[in-house]
Regions:
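Anion-coordinating catalytic cores for phosphoryl-, nucleotidyl-, and glycosidic chemistry
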Residues: 1-365
Length: 365
C-alpha cells in the first residue's frame, strides 16, 4: 500500500530522494516550492500549532495573512447593526467569509448509531423552534404537548417524557414573561442612524426598530444567557440610547432561559459605537484578538487569563472550544499565540473595549 500526500503540491511529491512512485512532475508546483524556499523566513514570537491534517506541518507555519489587507471600500462604511453584531460574534470568521469571500467548513454532524435517552443541542433547537411560537400565540399546554410528541425530537421512554414535561414548563414560563413585556402596544417604526468618524472617514451605523415600546426594547432567546446574548442586545441598545424617540425609555430587557437581564442607559453611546466601529474597521483588514466567550470569561473572572484560555482551547470540560472554530484557526495560522506574552495585551485591550461599557450598563435579575 502506498500512502500518497494529501496535497498535490506537498514537498514529499518533489523529493528526488524519496519514493519514485509518489513523485510528481507538475512544473508549476515545483517552481512554486522553489520560490517559497528561496524567500527569507519570517520570524514569529511563538510557533504556530501544527495541524494534524497537514502532511509535514509546513503549511501550518505559513501565515495565512502575512500583512494587513487594504482598507475596505466605501461600501463597507454603511454598517447595518446586524452586520456589526455578526462581526463581534466571530471577527476572524467574518474577515475570511465576508471580506475574503471564503466558504469555511462547519463541523460535520456525527452520525448516531444508537438512540439517545435525551435530545442533545442539535435536537433541542427544532423542538423549541416549533413550540415557542405556538405558545406565544396562546396555544394551551396540552395542545403544545401533542405538538411536541408529533415530532421526532422527543425520545421514547420515561427519560424522554420527563424531559418533555420539564421543557414544557420552562417554555410556558418563558412565554409568559415575553407576553407580559409585549402587552404594551408597539410604537411607530423608528429608524436610527449614527454617523461616526474613524481616521477621517465617516461610517454610518444604522438599524430599524419595528418593535419599540414605551418601556424600551425586548430581546429574548430560550437558552442560557451568555456573551452572545449581551452583545446582540447591546448594539441595538446603543442605537436606541443615541436616538431614542420621545416617550421611549432607553432600556433593553433580555429574557433568557435562566433569567432576565437589563441594559440601562449608556451615557456616551456615540463614543462607544465609535470604538466598536474602529475595531470593525481594523478587523476587516487583519485578524482581531477578540473572542467573545474567552474575552467574557477573562472579564467576568477578575481578569483571569487561565479562564480565558480554558474557553479558547479544547479540554475535557470544553470540547467545543472557541479556538477550534475553523475561521479562528485559519485566520490565526502562523501568527503568535493570542495569549502569549508578546501579544496578549491586544487581547486584553479588545476585551476591555467591547465589554467594559456593556458591563457598566448590565444589570442581572
Amino acid at each position: 500500500m502506498i500512502e500518497h500526500p494529501l496535497q498535490a503540491f506537498a514537498e514529499r511529491a518533489f523529493d528526488i530522494s524519496g519514493d519514485a512512485r509518489v513523485r510528481s512532475f507538475q512544473r508549476d508546483y515545483a517552481d512554486a516550492l522553489k520560490q517559497s524556499r528561496a524567500a527569507p523566513p519570517q520570524a514569529h514570537d511563538a510557533p504556530a500549532e501544527v495541524d494534524a491534517d497537514d502532511d509535514d506541518g509546513l503549511v501550518s507555519r505559513v501565515p495565512f495573512l502575512a500583512a494587513p489587507l487594504p482598507p475596505p471600500g466605501a461600501e463597507w462604511h454603511d454598517v447595518p447593526v446586524e452586520r456589526l453584531a455578526a462581526f463581534l460574534r466571530n471577527p476572524c470568521r467574518f474577515l475570511l467569509e465576508k471580506r475574503l469571500g471564503l466558504e469555511l467548513r462547519r463541523d460535520d454532524e456525527e452520525l448516531r448509531d444508537d438512540e439517545p435517552f435525551l435530545p442533545d443541542v442539535t435536537g433541542h433547537g427544532p423542538l423549541i423552534a416549533r413550540l415557542l411560537p405556538a405558545l406565544l400565540e396562546g396555544l394551551p399546554l396540552e395542545a403544545a404537548r401533542t405538538l411536541a410528541l408529533a415530532g421526532p425530537e422527543v425520545p421514547l421512554g420515561g427519560f424522554g417524557q420527563r424531559f418533555l414535561e420539564r421543557e414544557l414548563n420552562g417554555l410556558q414560563d418563558f412565554a409568559a414573561q415575553v407576553l407580559e413585556h409585549t402587552a404594551q402596544p408597539v410604537l411607530p417604526p423608528h429608524a436610527a442612524v449614527v454617523p461616526v468618524a474613524v481616521d477621517g472617514v465617516v461610517w454610518r451605523v444604522h438599524a430599524g426598530f419595528a418593535d419599540l415600546r414605551p418601556r424600551g426594547l425586548l430581546r429574548y432567546r430560550y437558552a442560557r444567557q451568555g456573551p452572545r446574548d449581551y452583545l446582540d442586545a447591546w448594539l441595538p441598545h446603543l442605537l436606541l440610547c443615541a436616538t431614542a424617540p420621545t416617550g421611549v425609555l432607553p432600556v433593553t430587557t433580555g429574557i433568557a432561559r435562566d433569567g432576565r437581564f437589563f441594559l440601562t442607559e449608556c451615557d456616551a453611546p456615540q463614543a462607544v459605537l465609535r470604538t466598536l466601529v474602529e475595531l470593525y474597521a481594523r478587523g476587516l483588514r487583519e485578524p482581531l484578538a477578540f473572542f467573545p466567550r474567552s474575552s467574557w470569561a477573562w472579564m467576568d473572572n477578575e481578569q483571569s487569563l487561565a479562564k480565558a484560555i480554558a474557553e479558547f482551547r479544547p479540554g475535557a470540560s470544553m470540547p467545543y472550544a472557541e479556538g477550534q472554530d475553523a475561521g479562528v484557526r485559519l485566520a490565526l495560522r502562523g501568527r503568535p499565540d493570542p495569549f502569549s506574552n508578546a501579544v496578549v495585551n491586544d487581547f486584553y485591550d479588545c476585551a476591555r473595549a467591547v465589554f467594559e461599557p456593556l458591563r457598566a450598563c448590565l444589570e442581572m435579575e
